[in-house]
Amino acid sequence: MDYYYINITTKDGEVMNWDGDNFIEYNDNVDDVKRYNTMEQAESAWDKAVELARSMQAKDIRITKAEFLADIVDFGIETVKLRDL
């Protein structure tokens, strides 16, 4: 199963995760992070996230895809959409 997340890099180089309304500090607890089941769902939140990221003077915003790799029981992470701000 693949999941999609929206992240930013702040002007200070910190990575923050989208919770559906705001960007929150990156940490290992992903319970508060908004997870999308499809790229289309993530893109539907893109404009709102970009607007907030710009107001925060973020360096960039991206949609990342986390893919479960059953053969090694791990996740592969790749950036599938990136915009420099």
Predicted segments, located by residue:
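Short aromatic-glycine-(Arg/Gly/Cys) micro-motifs in beta-strand/loop hairpins
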Residues: 1-32
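Short, mixed-charge low-complexity intrinsically disordered segments
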Residues: 39-85
